Structure formats: C-alpha cells, structure tokens
C-alpha cells in the first residue's frame, strides 16, 4: 500500500450528523455536510445556491419541469421571484397551467396514487400521481384564457409576452405568472403548445387573429446570456427547461459558473433529464471551473429544504 498516495486521497472523514431539538433547517443541512450520499450532495447544493444568490453579478436562471405547481411548490418560486432571486424563469406549459388554475381560486386536492382511475374518469376527476382536480377547473380555465386572448394586442407577440399578459390578468399574490409580470421577470416556455394554454391559443386562433412567433423569445433570451457577467442555473427536473437554459451558452463566449440539478432521473438511458452536469461540461454548457452538483431526490422534498437553508444564510449577511 502506498501510504503517501493514500494520504492524498483519504483527506475528508465522514462525520456523522448530530440531530438536536429545535434545530433550524440550515443547522440540519450543516450536519448533512459531514455525511455522504444524498445528504452530502444536498448540503453542497445549499452552499452553491447560497453563493449564487448572494452574487450580485450573477444572472440567476431557474428551470421548472415536472408537475411542481400542482404539488404545492408555486409559493416558493413566486417568493424567489419577488425577492429578486430568479432573474429568468424557463418552465413547462403544464406548470403555468396549474399556476393559473390556482390563481383563479380553483384548488388541487390531495388524493391517492392507489385508486380506481376508471371511477375517477366517471366522476370527471383528473389525477396527477396523488393530486386530484376536477374537469370543471379546466372549463373555467379555458373561459379565462379565451378572454385573455381576446384582449391581446393585434400584433406579433412572443410566447413570453403572452405569458406576461396572462399574469397581468391574475389576482393572486402566490401566482408565479402574476409575480413575474409585476417584477418584470421574463417567463419563457419553449413548448407552450404542449399544454392547455397552448391548446386554447390554437383554438382561439382558429376563429380569431392571434399572431405568436415561437422563435421570437430566442433573441431576447440570447441577449440576456450575452450581457451577463456570470450565470447560474437551478434546474428542477430536466426536459425542455433544462436544455433551453443550458444550450443558450453554446452561442456565447461563456459557460454557466453555477449549476444545481434536482432530479430523480439517471444518465444510463441518454435522456437529458438524467444527464449529469459533468456531461454538460463536455458541451461547454457548464464551465470547467463551475461549482455544480446533482441531487438525486424528489424536488418537492429538496427544493423547500434548500431554499429554507439558503434564506437563513442570506438573512444573516
């Protein structure tokens, strides 16, 4: 055994977490820092996210995939926008659909994944894992959207502009779209057609003038990327939001300096949602010296913990 070589490798002993009563989330996370596996990765994510949010020169991108809003994560994201911790939001259409549903006072309901889905269909109840919502909610949403589309300017619009107008028509301080519209934070949804918002836009366009340029957002988005001095990304899940954010740096002279990915997908199948941030370095999307980590766990568990711990640290600056 080469003891000198081993000493260079065996530098950081695992330190067991000590749990005491009345701990804050940040104190718990600091105990995680001495642990391995997911606990250690979560602690690293908090360290990186704190540094990213504390940096005034860093443009903060947030990728929102999956079904985070029906699961109850919208308040966290709206508050991050309101407090200046998200500069650019890229999302799936579904997240904004369910954000709008809630903003209209139409609730999602806790249900069960062990149920009779045929019975739910007969009762006109839709299921998202263990979340239920009535079909009637979509009828009400569609009526609202048709009214918004009827009031849009008769000029060519980007998808971002359409989402901003939807946000301006909402009256709910917990709404992501409303908060983003008020704070001037752009919300990009490259696959808006893949949602009820997009479907209703198409239905409206069948009988009325509606001019939406699906590529118009690219110019605005790339300008943000070119002008930023430093860039950081918090990625919930993968899919279109993750790729749209990371690919943007391919046409700029820089890469992301910070990157955090919260996912349950794995890299073996070659899909983007499971692709590691190390893999993104091979493309030049994430910088050679970037601070990055992937946390393999349910984002509805990890996001609140990370944000809570980081907010505690930010409040003590």
From Swiss-Prot:
GO terms for cellular component: cytoplasm. SUPFAM superfamilies: DHS-like NAD/FAD-binding domain. Keywords: Hypusine biosynthesis, NAD, Transferase. The keyword Disulfide bond does not apply. Pfam families: DS. GO terms for molecular function: deoxyhypusine synthase activity. The keyword NAD applies. Pathway: Protein modification; eIF5A hypusination. It catalyses: [eIF5A protein]-L-lysine + spermidine = [eIF5A protein]-deoxyhypusine + propane-1,3-diamine. Belongs to the deoxyhypusine synthase family. This is Probable deoxyhypusine synthase. The lineage of its organism: Archaea, Methanobacteriati, Methanobacteriota, Stenosarchaea group, Methanomicrobia. The gene is dys.
């Amino acid at each position: 055994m080469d003891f000198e070589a081993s000493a260079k490798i065996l530098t950081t002993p695992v330190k067991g977490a000590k749990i005491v009563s009345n701990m804050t989330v940040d104190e718990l996370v600091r105990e995680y820092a001495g642990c391995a596996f997911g606990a250690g990765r979560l602690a690293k994510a908090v360290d990186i996210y704190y540094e990213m949010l504390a940096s005034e020169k860093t443009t903060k991108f947030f990728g929102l995939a999956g079904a985070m809003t029906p699961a109850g994560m919208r308040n966290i994201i709206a508050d991050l926008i309101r407090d200046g911790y998200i500069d650019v939001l890229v999302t799936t259409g579904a997240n904004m659909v369910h954000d709008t549903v809630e903003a209209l006072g139409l609730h999602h309901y806790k249900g069960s994944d062990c149920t009779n889905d045929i019975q739910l269909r007969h009762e006109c109840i839709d299921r998202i894992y263990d979340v239920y919502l009535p079909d009637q909610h979509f009828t009400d949403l569609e009526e609202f959207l048709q009214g918004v589309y009827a009031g849009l300017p008769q000029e060519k619009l980007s998808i971002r502009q359409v989402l901003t107008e939807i946000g301006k028509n909402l009256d709910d301080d917990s709404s992501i779209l409303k908060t983003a519209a008020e704070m001037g934070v752009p919300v990009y949804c490259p696959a808006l057609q893949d949602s009820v918002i997009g479907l209703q836009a198409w239905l409206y366009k069948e009988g009325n003038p509606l001019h939406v340029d699906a590529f118009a957002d690219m110019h605005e988005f790339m300008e943000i990327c070119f002008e930023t001095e430093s860039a950081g990304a918090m990625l919930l899940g993968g899919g279109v939001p993750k790729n749209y954010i990371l690919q943007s740096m391919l046409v700029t002279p820089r890469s992301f300096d910070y990157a955090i990915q919260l996912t349950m997908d794995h890299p073996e199948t070659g899909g983007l949602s499971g692709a590691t941030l190390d893999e993104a370095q091979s493309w030049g999307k994430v910088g050679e010296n970037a601070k990055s980590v992937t946390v393999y766990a349910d984002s509805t568990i990890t996001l609140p913990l990370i944000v809570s711990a980081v907010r505690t640290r930010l409040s003590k600056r």
